[in-house]
């Protein structure tokens, strides 16, 4: 999460250098998954804040307490920097109850979703013209070429496929052997 904060802070500085007209979204909704309960949600929060938007975060129900602790730290940092902590709000409500209302709300300009492709399609059906940044279900491949070190390739494939119990969005699910 700290790496995300540093990355997006530096990215925000570069917006000034670009000499382009930049109009931030007013409100960004962050809807993260359960499997990385701090890093992924905070990445979305920091990206939206760095771009000048207010943030609503609706964490996965399995990890609300993690999100609450992280958001308290964000509020403390914002206050220390002289920024209103109210720019970041956490919603703790049933997904079925809150999801459609939040996504389709007239003041929400954009949604950052890390989750299933079906969820992205559902969000799009609720608000077709919104900006949806969706990192969704994927099949990730590792390509092993003839010049690869075989022992290192096996170790990396094993780590990618089975590290984090296969619950990482970038976990390898396909190995392509070339040559």
Residue locations for each model-derived region?
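Long amphipathic alpha-helix in the N-terminal Rossmann-like dinucleotide-binding domain
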Residues: 1-15
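Conserved small-residue-rich beta-alpha loop and adjacent elements
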Residues: 14-81, 130, 151
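A structured beta-alpha segment of the ubiquitous adenosine-cofactor-binding alpha/beta core
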Residues: 18, 89-112
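Generic hydrophobic/aromatic pocket-lining and core-packing "Φ" positions
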Residues: 45-46, 99, 120
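Short, surface-exposed connector motifs at secondary-structure boundaries
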Residues: 51-56, 82-85, 103-110
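Residue-level signal for inorganic ion chemistry
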Residues: 52, 88, 111, 138, ...
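General beta-strand structural signal in soluble alpha/beta enzymes
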Residues: 57, 90-92, 113-115, 132-135
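ALDH superfamily catalytic-core signature
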Residues: 73-82, 106, 116-179
């Amino acid at each position: 999460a700290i790496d995300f904060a540093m990355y997006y802070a530096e990215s925000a500085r570069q917006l000034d250098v670009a000499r382009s007209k930049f109009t931030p979204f007013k409100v960004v909704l962050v809807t993260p998954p359960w499997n990385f309960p701090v890093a992924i949600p905070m990445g979305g929060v920091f990206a939206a804040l760095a771009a000048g938007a207010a943030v609503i975060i609706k964490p996965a129900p399995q990890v609300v307490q993690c999100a609450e602790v992280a958001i308290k730290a964000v509020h403390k940092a914002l206050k220390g920097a002289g920024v209103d902590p109210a720019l970041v709000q956490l919603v703790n409500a049933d997904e079925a109850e809150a999801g459609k209302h939040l996504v389709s709300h007239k003041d929400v300009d954009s949604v950052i979703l890390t989750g299933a492709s079906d969820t992205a399609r559902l969000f799009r059906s609720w608000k077709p013209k919104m900006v949806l940044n969706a990192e969704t279900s994927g099949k990730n491949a590792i390509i092993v070429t003839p010049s690869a070190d075989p022992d290192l390739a096996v170790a990396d494939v094993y780590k990618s496929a089975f590290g984090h119990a296969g619950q990482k969005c970038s976990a390898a699910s396909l190995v392509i052997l070339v040559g």
